């Protein structure tokens, strides 16, 4: 079980801060990030390629694009501050880089929540080998 947890952390925690983003996802979707989004479609989880498979996967694609815009802020390792206020995620850093990364995660979590009804179990543990169509531009 411990090995499974470590693998799951490595898979979903590659961008942003695993626990912070996972907490945002849980608040907005009611789903555990590791079980539901670590390997989903072509973009949720490690890396991404091809065309997003559905609206849920497009949320992860958009997050990848957002991270690309703040790449100088080291989004894969950033630890930011945020809070939940009246059901909203509020990014609280004065540091512009940390706030930008938080906003990427915030937007993705909100998107996942707004599209939770598009979640398709057929895209859980989806093989990247199926992601061969040309990717959209960010």
From Swiss-Prot:
<comment type="subunit">
    <text>Heterodimer of a weakly toxic basic protein having phospholipase A2 activity (B chain) and a non-toxic acidic protein functioning as its inhibitor but which potentiates its lethal potency and neurotoxicity (A chain).</text>
</comment>
<dbReference type="GO" id="GO:0016042">
    <property type="term" value="P:lipid catabolic process"/>
</dbReference>
<feature type="disulfide bond">
    <location>
        <begin position="65"/>
        <end position="138"/>
    </location>
</feature>
<dbReference type="InterPro" id="IPR036444">
    <property type="entry name" value="PLipase_A2_dom_sf"/>
</dbReference>
<comment type="similarity">
    <text>Belongs to the phospholipase A2 family. Group II subfamily. D49 sub-subfamily.</text>
</comment>
<keyword id="KW-1015">Disulfide bond</keyword>
<keyword id="KW-0528">Neurotoxin</keyword>
<feature type="region of interest" description="Important for membrane-damaging activities in eukaryotes and bacteria; heparin-binding">
    <location>
        <begin position="121"/>
        <end position="133"/>
    </location>
</feature>
<dbReference type="GO" id="GO:0005576">
    <property type="term" value="C:extracellular region"/>
</dbReference>
<feature type="signal peptide">
    <location>
        <begin position="1"/>
        <end position="16"/>
    </location>
</feature>
<keyword id="KW-0629">Postsynaptic neurotoxin</keyword>
<dbReference type="InterPro" id="IPR033112">
    <property type="entry name" value="PLipase_A2_Asp_AS"/>
</dbReference>
<feature type="disulfide bond">
    <location>
        <begin position="44"/>
        <end position="60"/>
    </location>
</feature>
<feature type="disulfide bond">
    <location>
        <begin position="73"/>
        <end position="97"/>
    </location>
</feature>
<dbReference type="InterPro" id="IPR001211">
    <property type="entry name" value="PLipase_A2"/>
</dbReference>
<keyword id="KW-0800">Toxin</keyword>
<protein>
    <recommendedName>
        <fullName>Acidic phospholipase A2 inhibitor vaspin A chain</fullName>
    </recommendedName>
</protein>
<comment type="function">
    <text>Monomer: the acidic chain inhibits the basic phospholipase A2 of the complex.</text>
</comment>
<dbReference type="GO" id="GO:0006644">
    <property type="term" value="P:phospholipid metabolic process"/>
</dbReference>
<keyword id="KW-0732">Signal</keyword>
<dbReference type="InterPro" id="IPR016090">
    <property type="entry name" value="PLipase_A2_dom"/>
</dbReference>
<dbReference type="Pfam" id="PF00068">
    <property type="entry name" value="Phospholip_A2_1"/>
</dbReference>
<dbReference type="GO" id="GO:0047498">
    <property type="term" value="F:calcium-dependent phospholipase A2 activity"/>
</dbReference>
<feature type="disulfide bond">
    <location>
        <begin position="59"/>
        <end position="111"/>
    </location>
</feature>
<feature type="disulfide bond">
    <location>
        <begin position="66"/>
        <end position="104"/>
    </location>
</feature>
<dbReference type="GO" id="GO:0005509">
    <property type="term" value="F:calcium ion binding"/>
</dbReference>
<keyword id="KW-0593">Phospholipase A2 inhibitor</keyword>
<feature type="disulfide bond">
    <location>
        <begin position="91"/>
        <end position="102"/>
    </location>
</feature>
<dbReference type="GO" id="GO:0005543">
    <property type="term" value="F:phospholipid binding"/>
</dbReference>
<feature type="disulfide bond">
    <location>
        <begin position="42"/>
        <end position="131"/>
    </location>
</feature>
<keyword id="KW-0964">Secreted</keyword>
<comment type="function">
    <text>Heterodimer: postsynaptic neurotoxin.</text>
</comment>
<dbReference type="GO" id="GO:0019834">
    <property type="term" value="F:phospholipase A2 inhibitor activity"/>
</dbReference>
<dbReference type="GO" id="GO:0042130">
    <property type="term" value="P:negative regulation of T cell proliferation"/>
</dbReference>
<dbReference type="GO" id="GO:0090729">
    <property type="term" value="F:toxin activity"/>
</dbReference>
<dbReference type="GO" id="GO:0050482">
    <property type="term" value="P:arachidonate secretion"/>
</dbReference>
């Amino acid at each position: 079980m411990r090995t499974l947890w470590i693998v799951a952390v490595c898979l979903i925690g590659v961008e942003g801060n695993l626990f912070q983003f996972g907490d945002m996802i849980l608040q907005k979707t009611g789903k555990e990030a590791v079980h539901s989004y670590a390997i989903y479609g072509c973009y949720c989880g490690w890396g991404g390629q091809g065309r997003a498979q559905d609206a849920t996967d497009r949320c992860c694609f958009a997050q990848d694009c957002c991270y690309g815009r703040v790449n100088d802020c080291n989004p894969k390792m950033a630890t930011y501050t945020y809070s939940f206020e009246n059901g909203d995620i509020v990014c609280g850093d004065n540091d512009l880089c940390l706030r930008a990364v938080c906003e990427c995660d915030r937007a993705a979590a909100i998107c996942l929540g707004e599209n939770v009804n598009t979640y398709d179990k057929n895209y859980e543990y989806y093989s990247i080998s199926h992601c061969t169509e040309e990717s959209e531009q960010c």
